[in-house]
Amino acid sequence: MLIPGLPVAASVLVLPGGTDNSTTPFSRRQPAPMRMYPFTLSLRALPRVVVHQAVYDVHGWNGEHNSPLAPAQAALDRLIDAHPDSPVILVGHSMGGRVAAHLAADKRVAGVLALAPWWQHADWEYIHGEARVLALHGTADQRTYPARTEKGIAQLRERGVDAEFVPIEGGGHAMLDHVWTWQSTSLTFVRSFL
């Protein structure tokens, strides 16, 4: 929530999920972006925090096309241009967690919150060494791989990155269970930058 007369304390870019391969046009009414609305709304309630939810061109990653990266990078650039003095935190679910890892090669990114990230081919290696990283992953996730996320966080820590893995016991991919844990942990992470 922006407070007139006070500077922005943090900028947050929310990155929704998608799927492996799809050229279906992206819609805000698809389940993946709708799943992130509660996070976006909760984050917007934080004082002096600007929140933008990214909109991709198509619904899929699409192999080497890396389809969501260009629109997500453009959204990140706009957010930074509008608020150059505030730390930027990326919040990504599933494919959005993969997008966040790639965008976090940019040293202007202060933090990455990866929610059940779909990390492939060591995507976490893109994250620069000064970023703080928190990854939450449900232990019952059948779509993405909690063990891979935990491995990625361990490798980031070996590089000296401030990174933490939090397993959500019994949690599934859609984050429809343990809602309070997903939400409160996310809010606490973003608040830590204020």
Where are these regions (language model features)?
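Short, surface-exposed "cap/lid" segments of acyl-processing enzymes
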Residues: 1-46
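Active-site nucleophile loop of the alpha/beta-hydrolase fold
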Residues: 18, 114-121
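Alpha/beta-hydrolase active-site loop
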Residues: 62-82
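Gly/Ala-rich beta-loop-alpha elbow adjacent to hydrolase catalytic centers
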Residues: 91-96, 100
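Short beta-strand/loop motif that positions the catalytic acidic residue
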Residues: 129, 134-141
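Short alpha-helix in the alpha/beta-hydrolase fold that links the catalytic acid
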Residues: 145-155
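C-terminal catalytic histidine-bearing segment of alpha/beta-hydrolase fold enzymes
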Residues: 157-194
